């Protein structure tokens, strides 16, 4: 059992300097997230010209939300309705006719690492995002936006791969617990894989038109 807190951040919501924003197309990483850790990651390029704040924040583990513009052919794209098409003539049917069947961006909770990962002795700073959803297919080159809401812990070295995996799994639980509060949950839009609650967090940046 970890001695770290299972929730981070005040119940009142994110505090300055958060939220932080980051976006780009998903790139291939070191190839060890799924292979060695069983924790697949979607990487974004670290570009200080686009995200000048990234040079001044500590290396470590962060959490928040990611939005992905999955292509309509992707096997994990959410269905417009889990119960099938709405009955003709109902209010749901009218709303469905007005809204796109597949919105361009879908929101997921995420936990991410920004840093060098001392266990692997990386020489280049990376941004590795673990989307808290089980995907059946990759989504390289897909546009991804990040709304970073808080800091979980500093990065550190580990004596074993097992210790690293244990800490990452606990990071995921901390992220889920921390986001399962009214001020940390979206005010609009559906979060896939998150708690089913109506929150107050503005996530329009994740869903905006490009």
Question: Would you name each region that the model predicts?
Answer:
Residues 2-210:
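Phosphate/ribose-recognition catalytic cores of enzymes acting on nucleotide-derived substrates
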């Amino acid at each position: 059992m970890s001695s770290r807190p299972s929730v981070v951040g005040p119940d009142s919501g994110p505090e300055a300097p958060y939220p932080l924003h980051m976006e780009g197309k998903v790139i291939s990483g070191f190839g060890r997230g799924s292979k060695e850790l069983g924790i697949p990651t979607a990487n974004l390029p670290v570009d200080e010209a686009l995200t000048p704040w990234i040079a001044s924040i500590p290396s470590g583990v962060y959490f928040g939300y990611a939005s992905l513009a999955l292509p309509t052919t992707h096997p994990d794209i959410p269905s417009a309705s889990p119960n099938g098409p709405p009955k003709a003539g109902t209010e749901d049917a009218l709303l469905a006719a007005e809204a796109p069947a597949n919105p361009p961006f879908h929101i997921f909770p995420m936990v991410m690492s920004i840093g060098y990962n001392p266990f692997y002795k990386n020489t280049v700073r990376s941004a590795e995002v673990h989307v808290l959803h089980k995907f059946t297919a990759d989504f390289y080159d897909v546009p991804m936006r990040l709304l970073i809401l808080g800091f979980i812990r500093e990065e550190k070295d580990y004596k074993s791969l097992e210790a690293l995996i244990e800490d990452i799994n606990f990071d995921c639980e901390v992220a889920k617990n921390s986001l399962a509060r009214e001020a940390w949950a979206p005010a609009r839009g559906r979060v896939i894989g998150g708690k089913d609650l109506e929150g107050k967090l503005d996530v329009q940046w994740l869903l905006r038109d490009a």
